[in-house]
């Protein structure tokens, strides 16, 4: 009898959801990589001719898929007790984010989140590799590092990146100037109102003296 080596395979397709609030869906690019520096990252772009769902709050949503990843038995770590590879397993780590363009769309605030994806691939001893993925947010949408906690562990299978459109958003780097201007304007208005009240009070006082 000819010996046939034991083999098994499994697949997993990483997905993301792109959401826009307050505006229309544009061509946004998302990146997927097996390293935190996103070297040689795979990319997907929102499809303006594809299915775009309108959410309950009026936003626009589209789910995108990266290329399918295939796992083979020789990629996994065999059990010391089974040289055939049955029951072998391995953990893989990936990262996903939205690409921040050098020329962003006007009045859109981009989501700067980064998610770390942990994929567990386990041979089920019946020629199939079972693949499960868990997601953890490691950078929030404002670009800040997320501290270690459980609030950013996701139970769903599609990390969501939300961009916000607003004509009232200050231009990048101008928020401080805008706030200073508004504060100064408020002070001037208050001073003008106080002077107007003083003039009316003085005028009434003059009339009484006559």
Where are these regions (language model features)?
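Solvent-exposed loop/turn and edge beta-strand elements of beta-rich ligand-binding domains
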Residues: 1-210
């Amino acid at each position: 009898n000819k010996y046939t080596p034991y083999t098994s395979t499994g697949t997993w397709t990483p997905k993301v959801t792109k959401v826009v609030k307050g505006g229309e869906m544009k061509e946004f690019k998302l990146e997927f990589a097996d390293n935190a520096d996103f070297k040689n990252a795979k990319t997907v772009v929102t499809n303006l001719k594809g299915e775009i769902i309108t959410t309950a709050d009026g936003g626009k949503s589209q789910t995108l898929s990266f290329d399918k990843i295939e796992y083979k038995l020789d990629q996994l770590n065999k059990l010391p007790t089974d040289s055939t590879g049955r029951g072998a397993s391995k953990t893989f780590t990936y990262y996903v984010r939205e690409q921040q363009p050098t020329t962003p769309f006007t009045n859109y605030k981009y989501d700067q989140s980064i998610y770390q994806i942990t994929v567990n691939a386990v041979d089920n001893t019946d020629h199939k590799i079972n693949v499960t993925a868990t997601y953890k947010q490691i950078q929030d949408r404002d670009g800040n590092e997320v501290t270690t906690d459980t609030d950013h562990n996701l139970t769903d299978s599609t990390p969501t990146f939300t961009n916000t459109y607003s004509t009232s958003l200050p231009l990048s780097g101008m928020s401080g100037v805008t706030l200073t201007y508004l504060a100064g304007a408020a002070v001037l208005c208050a001073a003008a109102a106080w002077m107007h009240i003083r003039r009316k009070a003085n005028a009434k006082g003059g009339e009484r003296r006559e």
